Amino acid sequence: MAGSTSSLVICAIGIYATFLTWALVQEPLATRTWPNSMGKFQFPNVISLIQASVAMMMGYLYLNWKKVEYPPRKMIKDHWKQLMLISFTQSSSGPLATTSLKHVDYLTYMLAKSCKMIPVLLVHLLLYRTPIASQKKVVALLVSLGVTIFTIGGNDGKKLKRSFNESGNDNKLQGFGLLFSSLFLDGLTNATQDKLLKANKAKEKGKQTLITGAHLMFTLNLFVILWNILYFIVIDCKQWDNAVSVLTMDPQVWGYLMLYSFCGAMGQCFIFYTLEQFGSLVLIMITVTRKMVSMILSIIVFGKSVRFQQWVGMFIVFGGITWEALNKKKANIPKAKSA
C-alpha cells in the first residue's frame, strides 16, 4: 500500500464528484414536470437501459485499460447463470426504487437506499444460512429505528399519524413496498456477487480465470441491457414509446439523462477500482459519507425542509453504519499484524 495515498484521494474525489452529481441530477430527472410534454420522465426501465448502455461501454474501456487475461466472453460462458441472476436482481431493483418516488419523497428514498446492510444480512441469514453476529443485528435495528424516526418526523409522517385510512396513505404504503422490494433485490444482488467473487478467488490459480471489477462492470451491464429489452418486448412496450415521446417534445431531458448515466458509469469505475486496490472497508467509509453528503446537498440545493426528528433519524442511521465499519476495521487489525 506504500505510495497509494494519492490514488486513494483520487478514488475518493472521483466517487464524491460522480455520485454527488448523479444524485443531484436524479431528483429533477425523476420529479420535474417538463414544459412541452407536461409530464414527468418516470420511465425507470428506459433510464436503466440508457445507464447500463453507457456503463457497459465504460466497462469495456475499463477492461482494455486493465489488460485483463480472462476474456469477458469466456467469463460469461463460465458464469452465465450467476450473471443472469445478479443482473436480473440488479436491473429490477433500480426501476422499483425509481417508481417509489411517485409515492415517497426523495429524502426518504435516499435514506432507505442507505440501508442496504439490512437486506444483505437477511439474504445471508435466510438464503445462505450464514451466522450473523449480535453486533450486526444491533446495527440493523439502529438503521431501522433511524428510518422510522426520519419518516414519522417529516411532514408526510404527520399524515401517517393522523389516519391510516386517508387515500394518500395507500400510495405511501405502496411506495414503501416498492422500496422494500428494491432493497431486498439489492441484498440478493450483493450477496450473490460476494459468493461469485469468493468462489472465484478460492479456485483461481492464475490470472487466466481471475474475475475483476472490470469484468463485472462490463458483463452485468450487458445483461441488464438484455433484461430491459426483454421487458419492453414482453411486458411494457408502451413505456419505451412514452419515453421517446417525452424526449422528442422536451429534448433537454436528454442532457439530464446522459449526465445521469455518465456519472453513474464513472462512479462504477471508481468504486470497482477502490474495491480492488483498497478493500471493502475503505469503500464503505467513502460511500457512507457520500450518501450523507448527497442528502445534505439535496436539502441545500432543492430547499427540502427537514425537521429535528428527521436529523436525529439521519444521525442514527449513519451512526449505526459507521459503527459497523469501525468494528470491521478493528477486526482486521490482528489479521494485518499476523500477516
Curated annotation (Swiss-Prot):
One Gene Ontology term of the molecular function aspect: UDP-galactose transmembrane transporter activity
Topology Lumenal: residue spans: 1-4, 64-106, 158-174, 236-245, 304-307
Subcellular location: Endoplasmic reticulum membrane
Signal peptide: none
Principal localisation: endoplasmic reticulum
Record field: transmembrane: 5-25, 43-63, 107-127, 137-157, 175-192, 215-235, 246-266, 281-303, 308-327
Gene Ontology process terms (BP): UDP-galactose transmembrane transport; UDP-glucose transmembrane transport
Ranges of the Cytoplasmic topological domain: 26-42, 128-136, 193-214, 267-280, 328-339
Gene Ontology CC, one term: endoplasmic reticulum membrane
UniProt-listed SUPFAM superfamilies: Multidrug resistance efflux transporter EmrE
Keywords: Endoplasmic reticulum, Glycoprotein, Membrane, Sugar transport, Transmembrane, Transmembrane helix, Transport
Membrane topology: Multi-pass membrane protein
Carbohydrate-modified residues: N165
Role according to the record: May be involved in specific transport of UDP-Gal from the cytosol to the Golgi lumen. Involved in the maintenance of optimal conditions for the folding of secretory pathway proteins in the endoplasmic reticulum. Overexpression confers resistance to the immunosuppressive drug, leflunomide.
Family of this protein: Belongs to the nucleotide-sugar transporter family. SLC35B subfamily.
The name this protein goes by in its record: UDP-galactose transporter homolog 1
